[in-house]
Swiss-Prot record:
It is an enzyme of class 2 (transferase). The active site is at 89 (proton donor). (2S)-2-hydroxy-3-oxobutyl phosphate binds at residues 86-87, 128. This is 6,7-dimethyl-8-ribityllumazine synthase. GO terms for molecular function: 6,7-dimethyl-8-ribityllumazine synthase activity. One of its GO terms (cellular component) is cytosol. Its EC number is 2.5.1.78. SUPFAM superfamilies: Lumazine synthase (SSF52121). It comes from Desulforapulum autotrophicum (strain ATCC 43914 / DSM 3382 / VKM B-1955 / HRM2). Keywords: Riboflavin biosynthesis, Transferase. Pathway: Cofactor biosynthesis; riboflavin biosynthesis; riboflavin from 2-hydroxy-3-oxobutyl phosphate and 5-amino-6-(D-ribitylamino)uracil: step 1/2.
Amino acid sequence: MPQIIEAGLSAQGKKFGIIAARFNDFITERLVGGALDALTRSGAADGDITLLKVPGAFEIPLAAKKMAMTGKFDAIICLGAVIRGATNHYDYVCAEVSKGIACVSLDHGLPVMFGILTTESIEQAIERAGTKAGNKGFDTALAAIEMANLMTVMGEA
């Protein structure tokens, strides 16, 4: 039987950074609320959570890199909403933000979680920010907690 390594969902004693885009703030504020709810329900203290606001999703990877470089965080949660418009702008932003977040995570060996909604419409974004399709900010924070704990477990294995 293979060795199975899993981690729990306790945020107690862990430090979390949240980076949230202000663009489409009527969506991102709901994502932030969901993330904060997940973290506090899981035992994170208010003093263990840092919220950083950036202008838009495109700025998130640089902010995540700077946050990761401090060495103060066990996980970083990136939240934003990119909604398709009439031009190619959506495609470029989505591609670069996802690559940038992945690079920060790999370069720093740190869970940097992708909680960026990439939707075809405002309605889809609203659904994923706390209505029909749950709250992806909450889901992303739970994944961040699990990954932060997994990094600890793997460091001890």
